[in-house]
Amino acid sequence: MIEVPQHLYTRQADILHLETLIQELPDEAQVELHLTDGSRITGTVSIRPSVQVFRDSEGAQGFNAAVRIDDQQHPEHAHYIWMDRIAQVVHLGSA
């Protein structure tokens, strides 16, 4: 699992955006995630993520969330993706 996110969010609008993305990722949903870097990941959501509190290396507190996606072609491989890296969620069905 990823330990510390690269970005922490404190503004209500940013936290609301994370929560909106989370609603698109229910347990066992089959999805294709389009990431902000242009890459895509296809697989199954293992469990709906939740917004969590983190501290950065300087002790500043903020929020972020990560989702675990079990790879569609290699289910034994899991991807842990920070929610702020997701540009779009495409729903493919459910497991």
Predicted regions and their residues:
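Conserved RNA-binding domains used in RNP assembly and mRNA/RNA metabolism
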Residues: 1-95
